[in-house]
Structures are given as C-alpha cells and as structure tokens.
Amino acid sequence: FGCGKNGDIFNYVMEMDNISFVDALKKLAQYAGINHNSYTFAEDPKQKNQLQLLKRVSESYIKNLHAPIGEKVRNYLKHRGIDNFLLENFKIGYSGNIKSNEFLVSCLKKEGFSMNDMIDVGLVKQNPQKKNIFYFQQRIMIPILNNSGKVIAFGGRILGDGSPKYLNSPETFLFKKNKQLFGVLNAKKNLNKKRLIICEGYMDVISLSSHGYPAIASLGTALTDNHIENIFNISDEAFLVFDGDAAGK
C-alpha cells in the first residue's frame, strides 16, 4: 500500500473501513457482482460478541433518551435543532445516571455478557483500587459506526458546562481513533455533487447533515495519514472546517 503496509485487497478494505474480514468479503463480493447470500461465513467470536454488546447498549441509550429520565436531554437537543429524524438517523441516546447504568449492567449480565466484556469495549473502566466505574454518565450518547453501520464506540457530550465536554470511548479491539471518522455513511448519502466537509465535532456533522451537506468529523482536531486516506476514499475534494479556537487553528 502507499502507506508502507503490506497485505491483500481484503486487508486493505478491513483497514480502510475498519470492518471485519467477513464484512470486507461481503463488500468485495457485492462490488464484483457476486451473490454472497448463498454462502455462510464464520465470524471472529470476540468481534461478534463485542458488536452484539455495543448494539445492545446503543439500544438501551436510545430507550433512556425517550424515557422520563431523558426529558431534559430531549429539550436540549430540540433547542439545538435536532429533531426526531436526526435522533433516529444518528441513533442518539442518553447514558443516564448511576442507577440506570447499574440497571443496564445487570441486564447485560443476564444476557450473557461479562464485566470483562464491558471493560473490553470501553463501557466500564477500573480505577487504581480495581473498582469498576461507568465510563459514560449523564451524557448525550452518539454511536460511532464502522463502514458497515455497526456500533464500534461512542462519543458522549455532557449536559451543561462540565468537563470534558466531549468524551470518546477509549481505544479498543474495534475502535482505533487514528483511523475512524464519524458520519461516513450519512456523508456518502448526501455527497452527490457536493464537496465533503471535514469538521471537528459530532454536533457539527449532525447540524450540517440536517441541511443536506456531506460532513464527517475526525473525532478531534488531529488528522492522521489514515484519516486523510479514508477521506479521499470518500471524495476527491474536501473542505476543512475546524473551529476558530487555538486547537482548531
């Protein structure tokens, strides 16, 4: 590859789209006009388990948002111009408080997921005393998807003036910050003849998307070579629109 790595076409698609071998195989088969539905594929058990866990968590966050505990969040999002279509399109949710997180963990355990599974995907972390702490609390939750549309991580925005304002999932087996872009699937839908817009934050992407603009975010201000390669796999032209603060400059 141009980046100096070695591999075949499957490795390339897996790297660029941050997807599993099975998903890369299906994507290439579709591109080549081969019907892959008549074949069965053995997925990596660890990856399959983590994707199922994150999907389940994302569904729980969405339920929280539309429950009584999410009323304040819904009002905030409505004030920001995020309507029900955008909520559904970007699968936006709410992590809730400690009690709702404890309830979620108990449900996940009943469904066969272990605490180690939750630590591995970045939902729970351990402090120096080995006590388990919920990574996301009382945050607007925006799932980060791979190019197959599967949840691989989350971005959480705090309500009010707390710090940090945005909190991304830690790096995991599924999620590599130096490769992942936010909003790729929606940007491709809106691309047509419009130029791709690269911005900093989730809310920027969601706002631009609501007006029909193809936008993605780099999950921070630092663009890596992997990000740039992924960007030009989406579009030949792109505008860089970062914030006007010191970090954005």
Describe each PLM feature range:
Residues 5, 20, 179, 223, ...:
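Short acidic-hydrophobic sequence patches enriched in Asp/Glu that either
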Residues 30, 93-95, 124, 224-225, ...:
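Short secondary-structure capping/turn micro-motifs that flank functional sites
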Residues 1, 10, 196-198, 235-247:
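Acidic beta-strand-to-loop metal/phosphate-binding motif
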Residues 98-238:
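Phosphate-handling DNA/RNA-contact segment within nucleic-acid enzymes
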Residues 13, 218-221, 242-244:
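Short beta->alpha connector loops at strand-helix junctions that form conserved
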Residues 203, 223, 243-249:
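Acidic, metal-coordinating catalytic cores used for nucleic-acid/nucleotide bond scission
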Residues 1-116, 120:
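Non-catalytic accessory segments of DNA primases and related replication-initiation nucleases
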Residues 63-65, 95, 195-196, 218, ...:
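Residue-level marker of alpha-helix boundaries and capping positions
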